[in-house]
Every structure is written in C-alpha cells, then in structure tokens.
Amino acid sequence: GSDKPDLRNPLRIIDVTEFFQRCTFKPFIGKTVRAVKVHANMSKGFHEKLLKFATGIGMGGLGYLEVLEDKSYKGPIDKFIPDDMKAEFMELAGLEVGDTIFFMADKEDRAAFYAGQIRTELGEKLDLIEKNAYRFCYVNDFPMFERDPETKKIGFTHNPFSMPQGGLEALNTMDPLDILAYQYDIVCNGIELSSGAVRNHDMQIMVKAFEIAGYDEEVLKAKFGALYNAFQFGAPPHAGMAPGIDRMIMLLRNEENIREIIPFPMSGTAQDLMCGAPNEVTEQQLREVHIKVRQ
C-alpha cells in the first residue's frame, strides 16, 4: 500500500486476488485484488463519503461486504460469491461479525496504491490512529528496476548507483523486474526519516546495470564521466544513509507541513519569498560564474 507505512494505523491490507479469480465477479477477474477490513459502525453517510474519496483518487467504485450477526454477508459483491465459497472467504480474510471489508481491484501497482489510500482514510476518519506514539520500521528490498507504463521501457526504480542484490550474476541471469537493490529507508509514523543504500563499487556491475536501463557504455562515460573514471582506479565497498533532521523535528512538533519548521522555506512553486528568488540575472553575473546562455 505504501513504501512509507504508518504503523500507528492498526488496519492491514489483505491479498485476495487468487480467491476472486475463482468467483463470477467479472470486474475482479484478471486483476490484482486487495482488501482492507475494519470493525466499526459506519453509517450510510460514511459509506457515501468514502465512495466519494475513492472516486476522487481514481477508483471506479468501492465494493464492500458487511458481516451480519448470522455470519451472512451484506453488500454489492455478496451475490457474486458462490454460497459454497463464503465460509472459505470468511476464513481467508479473518472476518468476524460486525466487520466490513472493502475491495480495491486494478493493475498490481494501482491496486496497492488504492489499498494504501483507503487504509489511511479509514484509519483517520474512524479515529483508529494510535495517539502520542512513534512507530518506526525499516523498509528494504526495493526493486532495482521498473517498467515505464507509457514507454514500456525498463528504467531504474530509485538510485541507479545502488548495489543490486546478487551482484553481476543477478544482472546477467535474472529478469530485471525481479532484481532487488540493497536500498533501505527508516520510516516513522508514515514519514521517511532517513534513506540509504549499499552503493555499487564495481565497474562491471555499473556498466551492466545501465545497459539494462537502456544506456550503453559511451552514454555512461558522457553523463557520469567523473564516477566512471574514478571506478577505473577501484573503489572500496561502502554504504550509508542520509538522515532528514528537518523531518524528525516536524514529527516531534507534530507539524503536518515541513515548511513550518524550516526558517526560510520555499513556496510550493519553489520560490524564496524572502529573497525574491528566482529572479532575473545580468550578463555580468552570468560571466562571473562562467555560465553561457544559448538560444
């Protein structure tokens, strides 16, 4: 649902894809199906507001089931689950009387995104988020590569200079979309506080990784010449991470916007309102810093 999970939220996302491939509900067939269950009393008005939220983030609708006192279901999807499979679904999802379970079906990445958004919205609107708590977690095993949904080309997911898990052998033998990177984040209450990686220090790995992403060695030399040349002399294995001190202070002060704890923050359009930047520069100023503007 998110690569920055807020563990103060007790709701969890359930994968029910395989189950719904055996049902007769056509909108779910051939799609990834995620679900979020919650035990709470929700009015008709609450459901309407949640549906409005769902359509506002791009969902076509928001299917759900309620578990009644006799352990039967109530909801728009009930009739599409065969009677002989209803007990199986209750066990699969861990449902109890009084639970409501919401469904998100789409391509895998979109279904995950929608599930994360619905989980957060339910947690906030039903006041389920734990108060006065800091819940930390490490997030790791990020994918090294991803496929662009528009161009269909493979590119780097995050940092192209990270070490792939499995090294050169993985790059030579595995499906690029199955390769993981040695990358990691520290997250607290849904905020990324620190991000880092084991950096690649091997020339062959760097050349092969960029080749998979569509860059030959000549492009690598031209775009990252300094690093390419440095690798000719060898580099030690190294790793690290960069802490976001401003984000830590934001959490401690319970601020929603990071600009509230930065002395002279830029606006949402990247303007420095105190200094009036960016602004026009003179030809003399450009010469002083050896910048030439070409039309």
Where are these regions (language model features)?
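Structured aminoacyl-transfer and RNA-binding surfaces used for tRNA recognition/handling
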Residues: 1-295
